[in-house]
Amino acid sequence: MKITSLPRLMRVFLPVAVLALPLAWQTAALAQSATCTQGSTCVSVGGNNDPMSKEQARQSQQQWDDTHRLRNKVNNRAEKNFDKYDRAEDAKDNCDRSANFNAYWEPNTERCLDRLSGRQINP
């Protein structure tokens, strides 16, 4: 390769490189912004101040709050039912271990009753 062909190559490829560099830079920036989808954690400066994104964020927060409240209600109900069942089992065990021979456990009402009078007793 002659030395005179090097300046000719630079004259041809330098403008191409100058045009290609900003395009390559822009492609990388677009590829990075394409990874920021809804629900992912992305940081942007001043770009999301439009009313639609604020409304979507408000609706998302409201939906999360409603779901959280509903989950708490379901958990409280399950805990309440478990406590009720647990107390009934403890009362049944106490009735069965009672020294009173006339005490028996009534499963329908979940009470310890006296065989003779039918009244509730505390063993």
Curated annotation (Swiss-Prot):
<comment type="similarity">
    <text>Belongs to the UPF0482 family.</text>
</comment>
<feature type="region of interest" description="Disordered">
    <location>
        <begin position="47"/>
        <end position="66"/>
    </location>
</feature>
<protein>
    <recommendedName>
        <fullName>UPF0482 protein YE2026</fullName>
    </recommendedName>
</protein>
<dbReference type="Pfam" id="PF06932">
    <property type="entry name" value="DUF1283"/>
</dbReference>
<keyword id="KW-0732">Signal</keyword>
<feature type="signal peptide">
    <location>
        <begin position="1"/>
        <end position="31"/>
    </location>
</feature>
<dbReference type="InterPro" id="IPR009700">
    <property type="entry name" value="DUF1283"/>
</dbReference>
